[in-house]
Amino acid sequence: MGGCCSCFRDSSDDVSVLPITDNEREAVTLLLGYLEDKDRLDFYSGGPLKALTTLVYSDNLNLQRSAALAFAEVTEKYVRQVSRDVLEPILILLQSQDPQIQVAACAALGNLAVNNENKLLIVDMGGLEPLINQMMGTNVEVQCNAVGCITNLATRDDNKHKIATSGALVPLTKLAKSKHIRVQRNATGALLNMTHSEENRRELVNAGAVPVLVSLLSSNDPDVQYYCTTALSNIAVDEANRKKLAQTEPRLVSKLVSLMDSPSSRVKCQATLALRNLASDTSYQLEIVRAGGLPHLVNLIQSESVPLILASVACIRNISIHPLNEGLIVDAGFLPPLVKLLDYRDSEEIQCHAVSTLRNLAASSEKNRKEFFESGAVKKCKELALDSPVSVQSEISACFAILALADVSKQDLLDADILQALIPMTFSTNQEVSGNAAAALANLCSRIDNYSKIISSWDQPKEGIRGFLKRFLQSNYATFEHIALWAILQLSESHNDKVIYLIKNDKEIINSVRKMADVTYDRLQKSGVDVNKNGNSEERGDNEDHQSNNDRNLANSTSSDQYEDASMELYNITQQILQFLD
């Protein structure tokens, strides 16, 4: 505390020049004693606080400086929740025009702003306005400490909107371009803290922060790079911001792609996350690939860092949504590492993104389909199908449903014994899992050359295909009923004597179909629909793959007209089946 003591002693030489009142002289004497024993005393109450406060309100500049220095040193060592009585004199000092006092007062306030309760009280007491004024000054040390204090204040959610609307964002943005690295770090850190809500992000964009953040991606300082990449990643969460970025920041993607090769792991991770968020939009999905993002991503998903793996697999998942990227992703060598990530049982999220990416790649070209099967993806998904979290099962079942849509894939799936996984998955209590598995199963019953796998799985595992058909027919859920009826219709039209025999001689299935016909007929009659007029099933596209029907039914649950259409479709299929059986 030598600085403060020295200041007190210097001031005593100027007594004749600088007036000191008796109570100020007493406060100086007491404070010098307190400072000698500072480790055992509480400077936030009682005598020490009273002595400091007396000096703050003095007209003597040296005494004010001494008080500011004392507050700075004490708060650096002892940080805890304090009262208004402590903050008030510091806020008074903050309004001083003296640079020494400004530096120390900002430092003291920033130290106390580490405490969560103090953060709220400082803002409530009007601390933002003097801090903003100090940021707009010319003294680098003052700027640095003022910005640092606002950075701390902005970590409390209650303060974020108040800061965003206080006028602080424009000077913070300006200071982010400072030539002084400490000021730049604090300013970009403060801007980052303002990106955690949509409203504040909008204020930040309107304050002109985005071009500054993008320009600072080229900074040589890893902390500044980290703050800027993270801030931009958060800003890119909002669709409106992504559109604005696409219009105004043509170099953003190339800069972020370059940062995926940063020596700093956290910069690398945040750059990848920023690209993932941007890749929510179609245009960015293409641009990231054009900018050379794939080689970086294929390396990152094979790294040893879980955050890097998660960020990169989430990014490639979004990029793989665009059909034009599918072949390029396969050619870049993503299939083997993606299949390997399916074993990443410590991270459900990584598994989900990996399966989702594989699903997007599965239904592209014949070349990609062939490589997909050769990669072992189907085998691995089958292994995980019954032994993974529901979220992963949902992605796997969706992948199977997509694969089963393509006629060229059906026999390969059957040969891979996919029915051993699909049939048990139809028992899932999760409708996405059971519905996707059932849709895949139904599609595998349609337009195939070899029905041996269907026949051998008729009553096993877990009651087999027969059990699935019965359960779904009796589910009282229109989408599931439709899947079962559609599967029965496909089997009835298989031209396979054994399959047809199994259908025709299963009284439970036939009775369920007849019951469904009666139920749907009654529904239509009650709705006033003329079944004979509208029920020309010969003209309907009932032989299309089942996913389109399934999706349509899922979407048509609110409108009475759509409900009637769904009932009519179910009725038509029952009539086709019964016509065949008769």
Curated annotation (Swiss-Prot):
<feature type="lipid moiety-binding region" description="S-palmitoyl cysteine">
    <location>
        <position position="4"/>
    </location>
</feature>
<dbReference type="GO" id="GO:0000329">
    <property type="term" value="C:fungal-type vacuole membrane"/>
</dbReference>
<keyword id="KW-0519">Myristate</keyword>
<feature type="repeat" description="ARM 4">
    <location>
        <begin position="157"/>
        <end position="196"/>
    </location>
</feature>
<dbReference type="GO" id="GO:0045121">
    <property type="term" value="C:membrane raft"/>
</dbReference>
<keyword id="KW-0926">Vacuole</keyword>
<dbReference type="GO" id="GO:0031503">
    <property type="term" value="P:protein-containing complex localization"/>
</dbReference>
<feature type="repeat" description="ARM 7">
    <location>
        <begin position="282"/>
        <end position="321"/>
    </location>
</feature>
<comment type="function">
    <text>Functions in both vacuole inheritance and protein targeting from the cytoplasm to vacuole.</text>
</comment>
<feature type="repeat" description="ARM 3">
    <location>
        <begin position="116"/>
        <end position="155"/>
    </location>
</feature>
<dbReference type="GO" id="GO:0071562">
    <property type="term" value="P:nucleus-vacuole junction assembly"/>
</dbReference>
<dbReference type="GO" id="GO:0071255">
    <property type="term" value="P:Cvt vesicle assembly"/>
</dbReference>
<dbReference type="InterPro" id="IPR011989">
    <property type="entry name" value="ARM-like"/>
</dbReference>
<feature type="compositionally biased region" description="Basic and acidic residues">
    <location>
        <begin position="536"/>
        <end position="549"/>
    </location>
</feature>
<dbReference type="GO" id="GO:0043495">
    <property type="term" value="F:protein-membrane adaptor activity"/>
</dbReference>
<feature type="lipid moiety-binding region" description="S-palmitoyl cysteine">
    <location>
        <position position="5"/>
    </location>
</feature>
<dbReference type="GO" id="GO:0042802">
    <property type="term" value="F:identical protein binding"/>
</dbReference>
<dbReference type="InterPro" id="IPR016024">
    <property type="entry name" value="ARM-type_fold"/>
</dbReference>
<keyword id="KW-0677">Repeat</keyword>
<feature type="repeat" description="ARM 8">
    <location>
        <begin position="323"/>
        <end position="363"/>
    </location>
</feature>
<dbReference type="GO" id="GO:0031965">
    <property type="term" value="C:nuclear membrane"/>
</dbReference>
<dbReference type="Pfam" id="PF00514">
    <property type="entry name" value="Arm"/>
</dbReference>
<feature type="lipid moiety-binding region" description="N-myristoyl glycine">
    <location>
        <position position="2"/>
    </location>
</feature>
<feature type="compositionally biased region" description="Polar residues">
    <location>
        <begin position="550"/>
        <end position="561"/>
    </location>
</feature>
<dbReference type="GO" id="GO:0034497">
    <property type="term" value="P:protein localization to phagophore assembly site"/>
</dbReference>
<feature type="lipid moiety-binding region" description="S-palmitoyl cysteine">
    <location>
        <position position="7"/>
    </location>
</feature>
<dbReference type="InterPro" id="IPR045156">
    <property type="entry name" value="Vac8"/>
</dbReference>
<feature type="repeat" description="ARM 6">
    <location>
        <begin position="239"/>
        <end position="280"/>
    </location>
</feature>
<dbReference type="GO" id="GO:0034517">
    <property type="term" value="P:ribophagy"/>
</dbReference>
<dbReference type="GO" id="GO:1903044">
    <property type="term" value="P:protein localization to membrane raft"/>
</dbReference>
<dbReference type="GO" id="GO:0000425">
    <property type="term" value="P:pexophagy"/>
</dbReference>
<protein>
    <recommendedName>
        <fullName>Vacuolar protein 8</fullName>
    </recommendedName>
</protein>
<dbReference type="GO" id="GO:0000407">
    <property type="term" value="C:phagophore assembly site"/>
</dbReference>
<feature type="repeat" description="ARM 2">
    <location>
        <begin position="75"/>
        <end position="114"/>
    </location>
</feature>
<dbReference type="GO" id="GO:0071563">
    <property type="term" value="C:Myo2p-Vac17p-Vac8p transport complex"/>
</dbReference>
<keyword id="KW-0564">Palmitate</keyword>
<keyword id="KW-0472">Membrane</keyword>
<feature type="repeat" description="ARM 9">
    <location>
        <begin position="407"/>
        <end position="446"/>
    </location>
</feature>
<feature type="repeat" description="ARM 5">
    <location>
        <begin position="198"/>
        <end position="237"/>
    </location>
</feature>
<dbReference type="GO" id="GO:0042144">
    <property type="term" value="P:vacuole fusion, non-autophagic"/>
</dbReference>
<dbReference type="GO" id="GO:0034727">
    <property type="term" value="P:piecemeal microautophagy of the nucleus"/>
</dbReference>
<dbReference type="GO" id="GO:0000011">
    <property type="term" value="P:vacuole inheritance"/>
</dbReference>
